[in-house]
Amino acid sequence: MGIFDDVNNWEKTEGAKIISSIIDVADPVILDYGCGAGNYSFAAAYAFDQKCKVYAVDINRQCLDYISEKAKSEKIGCIDAVEGREDYRQDFDSDTFDLVIYADMFHGEEKIYGGFHRFIMIEEAKRTLKKGGTLAVLPFHLSNFRDKDRKKSKYTYKKLIDEITEYGFAYIDNELQGIHFEKVYSPYYQQKGGITFESLERGKLLIFEK
């Protein structure tokens, strides 16, 4: 069994279990922002047996085409692949979502905000989440963050939690871990070889309630 089979199996089993443990809502509306290949979108679809609506948002058209084709082949009709905006704002109404997922999105120095994009994303999560809704943040590359002085800074989970709670979110401690799927789809790592599902990076999933 290859790594893509392992990933598909994770989406249907462990990934689905993680999503269903985060929220207990009938027919939830979910945003997977910066979705990449849609691993967490598919996990959400399986978590609720497609009795949900999932918006998989990314600025990469190739990712969205991949998600649409995969959803079609797996007969999943609850996922909408939506092209995102480069300014990290969301074209959704306020109080729309039961769950917002930000996986591997907060690090780096993007061209518009110089590394401050995560603050825009937190603001947008607060706006678009329903009251009592859940924000799930899966941060990686913690040594490649920008602090509020725009200086490169090594972050900790606690420092990031403190930042997010300043926006009025309540942190919910848990033992959940997510997976960093970047290497699965990276041409560089595919060419390099040697990537196994077991070798993929795991990280703490930070859960907040609006």
What is each stretch, according to the model?
Residues 9-28, 43:
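Conserved alpha-helix/loop element of class I SAM-dependent methyltransferases that forms part
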Residues 27-36:
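Conserved class I S-adenosyl-L-methionine
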Residues 31, 42-89:
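Class I SAM-dependent methyltransferase SAM/SAH-binding core
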Residues 90-100:
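A short acidic, Gly/Pro-enriched loop at the edge of an enzyme's catalytic core
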Residues 98-117:
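A short SAM/SAH-binding and catalytic strip from SAM-dependent methyltransferases
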Residues 116-131:
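A short glycine-rich, Lys/Arg-flanked "PGG" loop and its adjoining helix->strand segment in the class I
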Residues 132-139:
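Conserved beta-strand signature within the Rossmann-like core of class I S-adenosyl-L-methionine
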Residues 169-210:
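Class I S-adenosyl-L-methionine
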